[in-house]
Structure formats: C-alpha cells, structure tokens
Amino acid sequence: MASVAPYMPEGRRGIHFMQQWFNLSNPAMEDALHDAPPFRDFAGLCGLDDRLPDETTILRFCHVLEQHQLAPQILKTVDDLLQHKGLKLKTGTVVDATLVAAPSSTKNATGERDPETMPSKKGNQWYFGMKTHIGTATDSEPVHTVRGTSGNVNYVAEANSLLHGEETEAWSHAGSQGAGKRPDAKPGVRWNIAMRPGKRKQLDPEDRPIEQLTDELERIKARIRAKVEHPSRVIKPQFGHLNVRYNGLAKNTAQLHTFFTLANLWMAGKHFQGAQAEVRPTCLKAAGKPPLGALTPGRCHEAAAG
C-alpha cells in the first residue's frame, strides 16, 4: 500500500500479513520462506537472485509499522476501500472490548511482568493482560476503530473514543453504562446500552406488558450487538491470536490493527465476490504439507479461506 511503500518494499508487507495469518514468530517466518515455495511466491521472492529476509529484517518491518503508525493507516485504507465498494461503515457503531492474556511473572522469560499490562477481573475470574477495544458498524461487521489498553481499564473509559464521529446511534453492553454522560461524550450520539443483568432478571414479562416490551427491547439490542463479536472470533480461533506477543501496548496495538485489517477483508468476502482471494491468495492454498507444525493445510484453509 502507498502508506507502506516509502518505508519498505511491497514483499515485506506480504510477509507481515502471512505472519499474522499463521501466527508465526520471526524465526518461524524466516524458516517458512526458505522451506515453502508458496510463501516466497506470495512475498514476490520468486527469482533466483532474490534475497530472502532473515528474522532481523522481518522484525525491523514491525518496528517501522509501529514507529510511523502505519498499521492504523492500513486499516483506514482498507475500510475506505470497502466503503467505496458499497459496504456501510459510517452508520451506527457497536463497541466492545475483549481481554488478551499476557505471560505472568512466573512464566515470563525474564521473570518480570510487562509494566503496561495489568490484572482484570471478569466475573469471578482474574486475568492478566491487555484489553482490545473495537468499534464496528451496525450495518456490517468490519472494524473501523481499534484501541489497546491495560487490562484494568474500564470498558466505559474507552467507549466514546471508539466512535468515528459520523454516527447518531451507539450500542454497547452493560459495562458501558454512563458512556453518554462522560466528559468525552460526543454530542448528537444516543447510546443504546444493555440493561444490567441483575435488573433484567427482575423483569416480569409474563404479567406486566411494559416489562414485556422492555425485555423485547433488550433482545433487539443483543441482536445488534452480536455483530461486534465476529471480528474477535476471526482473529482469535482462526488467526490464533490468543495471547499478546510483545512487551508494551504500542507494539501489541500495532499488531491488532493488522489483525483487524485482515479480519475485515475476510469478513467482507461474503459481501463481495473474490474478496477471499485478497485475504489468502491462491498460491498459499497450494502450500501442501508445510515444514512447520503451525502451517497445516487445515490451519491454512481456516485462516483465510473460511
């Protein structure tokens, strides 16, 4: 893409995307380029004189994305393209957050915690890591805004930052109660936030017509909010992003922007003919049995073909 071209050759972008699809470390990506011809083809390294990048070169490209804040620009470019193709991204917004686990101090190689990740309680369970906050359009699934924070940041604290500024309706779960009354609330936006579970249990829809309508309204809210779960389903079980890979929120947030860029293309495949080929080109489908355990044909098919 044009935003990346001044900093690195086009092939580096393809290598970076393959890293995310197959959840590969820098050394594993270097090995895959040497051992799997389809990976070299996708990166444009097909000639005999082409020099394959080593793990240090691959790492430098990640640093370039982070330092110049290119990953958010790539996400915006893809969203603009999808919108130009007819996908509605500027209507209402559904916001959500999900926890991504980080190594604890006992499992970390250095024996130290990442100072930018914090513990967070969900239900009766404690987690240690970061939170991924996203905003998606109500009429479609692609993500338009991504924010990365420590695990202890409350959902409502980031709710208004996930709006693109052109919507009049916003939707969220009960954890965002009070979003419309915060100092950073945007004028003209009406928040449709789920009722707290305890209050909803007290409803008596069978004997009270008004509470029956309230219960039905909560069902409608839940159906609208359900779309925001789809992008996380793509990047977690399909792309394998179950734990943070780096130390520091900046590096992990840059990776999240890339993940959701690829997830947007994957999800847009059902709206546009041929969009799946943009996510995983044909050359990767024919990779056969790769040398690495992480690159099984089934995993390759799941990660991009759907």
Across the structure, where does each feature detected by a protein language model lie?
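A short, flexible helix-boundary coil/loop motif
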Residues: Q238, K270-G306
